[in-house]
Amino acid sequence: METKPNPRRPSNTVLPYQTPRLRDHYLLGKKLGQGQFGTTYLCTEKSTSANYACKSIPKRKLVCREDYEDVWREIQIMHHLSEHPNVVRIKGTYEDSVFVHIVMEVCEGGELFDRIVSKGHFSEREAVKLIKTILGVVEACHSLGVMHRDLKPENFLFDSPKDDAKLKATDFGLSVFYKPGQYLYDVVGSPYYVAPEVLKKCYGPEIDVWSAGVILYILLSGVPPFWAETESGIFRQILQGKLDFKSDPWPTISEAAKDLIYKMLERSPKKRISAHEALCHPWIVDEQAAPDKPLDPAVLSRLKQFSQMNKIKKMALRVIAERLSEEEIGGLKELFKMIDTDNSGTITFEELKAGLKRVGSELMESEIKSLMDAADIDNSGTIDYGEFLAATLHMNKMEREENLVAAFSYFDKDGSGYITIDELQSACTEFGLCDTPLDDMIKEIDLDNDGKIDFSEFTAMMRKGDGVGRSRTMMKNLNFNIADAFGVDGEKSDD
């Protein structure tokens, strides 16, 4: 059931058919979220007044034919799975000259981890219900010939704030149709959840069970099973690290739960338990196997900390990159000009592709797209000069004291010596990061809990490797970026 390009489809369209105008049928409301490609809005159907979610994807972000095919495949897969009770149901698709719109069921109950944290208590028995749902989605995907490839907590939402809300899988942007026995080779997913065979670039549907096993480990302990200060360190742990069942809270967790995790996080895909077999495991089937006593509150606090990505750090890196001296930047300015052939001040996908070809690179189009995604901090579809420098400069230049002072001052607009929530709001607006939970962002960095960030807290954040990457593909995380592609030596000493 492989998706094939439709030969009759015009080259600048995603859908192989014409559609009515979205606004003739729906009223667009508030923004619900921002993804790598699209923005999701609340929308209301005019004829019924029913609320839905509308994911709007700007076509300017679809820079190559492969991107158009990816969106069309995502739509097909959503239709393919739409009868499953724990998959967000697609309502319809619309396309005009500027956007592709996917209208789907709206989920107003929040993300998986956020819901657990806000409840304030959690038990193994509750974890059973959640992982049973997740494994049920995986089993359904595999039985219908679909590999999800990006299972992570952010892709599971509750359909309502009620206690009996259903957990639903969303975002099939990396999902693919596959045939039994077929292997895939492109490295995609999210660092903590990726299976070892993905890193080895030869894998099948078993990767989804691994990712579900990682989610289960985090649900019960509040931390990922394979962790390191850097993303390359995380990958080393995934390939070689031992599962920790000795430190808290594992001594208090049932043996049955640990046995299931062992079987889901088996490194050999051939020996790994299938989704169906996992659903038949005693911990899931036998109600008495999973205790109902609350887990240690420390698990919840760790879970909250883990689920917040550090967005301030990304903004700060770009601020630093833009203030470095000509000498520190070296030949990067000339390289940027060489790639930016129309002198627009931004690099498009086509310019990046042409620039790489000129320096003799033999990267595939999908790999060049990966570099683009990794460098494009504000998801604009192009790389500006600041983003280019942030992607190509070595970190030890970024972390020098005077650069950290300058970045701190950028946020600390009134020079008070602290970054406040209002100043953070202002910076997020400038960077186009709307609807970001600022309270959580500050709490993550605010070590003395005074509600603001001082310079020492800011410096500690900048020098800590958080490894929380969410790139569409992970070439950047596999120690490969634009600097490598152009042969730039970003690691020269700063002497």
UniProtKB/Swiss-Prot annotation:
ATP binds at residues 32-40, 55. It comes from the Eukaryota. Ca(2+) 3 binds at residues 412, 414, 416, 418, 423. Activated by calcium. Autophosphorylation may play an important role in the regulation of the kinase activity. InterPro entries: CDPK_Ser/Thr_kinases, EF-hand-dom_pair, EF_Hand_1_Ca_BS, EF_hand_dom, Kinase-like_dom_sf, Prot_kinase_dom, Protein_kinase_ATP_BS, Ser/Thr_kinase_AS. It catalyses: L-seryl-[protein] + ATP = O-phospho-L-seryl-[protein] + ADP + H(+); L-threonyl-[protein] + ATP = O-phospho-L-threonyl-[protein] + ADP + H(+). Induction: By drought and high-slat stress, but not by low-temperature, heat stress or abscisic acid treatment. The keyword Magnesium does not apply. May play a role in signal transduction pathways that involve calcium as a second messenger. Functions as a regulator of the calcium-mediated abscisic acid (ABA) signaling pathway. Phosphorylates ABA-responsive transcription factors ABF1 and ABF4 in vitro. This is Calcium-dependent protein kinase 11. The lineage of its organism: Eukaryota, Viridiplantae, Streptophyta, Embryophyta, Tracheophyta. The gene is CPK11.
